[in-house]
Amino acid sequence: MANILTIFLLISTLVTGIFWSFYCIKSFKNYLINKKIINNNNFHQEKIEKSKNKTYFLKSLASFFPIFLAIFIIRSFIYEPFQIPSGSMMPTLLVGDFILVEKFSYGIKEPITHKILIRTKKPNRGDIAVFQHPTDHNINYIKRIIGLPGDKIRYDLHDKHIHICTNYSDQRGCEKKISINYSQSRSSNFIQKIYFSNKNNIKEDKNIYNSLYFDIVEEIIEDVKHSILLLNSIKNTKENYFQQKNMPKLTWIVPKGEYFMMGDNRDNSLDSRYWGFVPEKNLVGKAIKIWMSFDKNENEWPTGIRINRIGSIH
């Protein structure tokens, strides 16, 4: 969907740009005629009227060119709005948040192939980034950057903590262990609905659910502090996690030019723990602000506006 919209904007900009060029040429020619700079006795009144009609038609189409051009440039190279559709980044981002993504944060890229044209700065650990899914470029995800190229990452299933060391190699091991601290967990108002069926397995039973309350924990990775949600009442197993070649499960070494992403809602997020690393070329940009927030649940209509959520993202 993301690439389709970009291609549509590009084609629309090119087509209206052609009409805009014809309109400019036609307008200049009419200007010369009206000033009697072109001496052409074959221009009768009827032909002049037809020329005016054609000019009006061209003007109507050409008027869209500046609009499409501005949208294409801003959306492709500067800022792009996104909507948060799921709760994988709770409590930092909620369903119904509309965010602004800075497209030039990780380099100015060609909008179709995403080849980096001008490098700006590298992604930082702790950034919240929008990216294309590694295997399906039509799907955009938003997660927090946890692992940088060369990092060795270990995820502890028991306490759900992460352990990171930088510039790992088989010969010298880790260069530096990243400081990661966790607060004591406390109860929160965030709820995870667990759906189930009754004995008769009736279709309407999709509306029957039990609710589990998330615990909230402060996670501090070096100097980046943020909150994460955990379902401590649920114990995960290793089976579904991504296993890197020649590595034990739950331990990964981030390849060169790739990144390890995780959602802040740790027990309700499909991320690099499940499908692997994200290439740098897949990074769309850095999420910087919430510009609108509707009070809504997933797959439901909004019931209000959350003005207090508008502002910067941390």
Curated annotation (Swiss-Prot):
This protein's record includes keyword Repeat: no
UniProt subcellular location: Cell membrane
Entry EC number(s): 3.4.21.89
Record membrane topology: Multi-pass membrane protein
UniProt keyword Nuclease, yes or no: no
Keywords tagged on the record: Cell membrane, Hydrolase, Membrane, Protease, Transmembrane, Transmembrane helix
Matches recorded under Pfam families: Peptidase_S26
Residues passing through the membrane, by range: 5-25, 64-84
InterPro entries: LexA/Signal_pep-like_sf (IPR036286), Pept_S26A_signal_pept_1 (IPR000223), Pept_S26A_signal_pept_1_CS (IPR019758), Pept_S26A_signal_pept_1_Lys-AS (IPR019757), Pept_S26A_signal_pept_1_Ser-AS (IPR019756), Peptidase_S26 (IPR019533), Sign_pep_all-beta_subdom (IPR019766)
Segments in the Cytoplasmic topological domain: 26-63
Gene3D superfamilies in the cross-refs: 2.170.230.10, Umud Fragment, subunit A
Catalytically driven reaction(s): Cleavage of hydrophobic, N-terminal signal or leader sequences from secreted and periplasmic proteins
One GO-annotated biological process of the protein: signal peptide processing
Segments in the Extracellular topological domain: 85-314
GO molecular function: serine-type endopeptidase activity
NCBIfam families recorded: PRK10861.1, sigpep_I_bact
Family per similarity comment: Belongs to the peptidase S26 family.
Protein name: Signal peptidase I
The species this protein was found in: Buchnera aphidicola subsp. Acyrthosiphon pisum (strain APS) (Acyrthosiphon pisum symbiotic bacterium)
Organism lineage string: Bacteria, Pseudomonadati, Pseudomonadota, Gammaproteobacteria, Enterobacterales
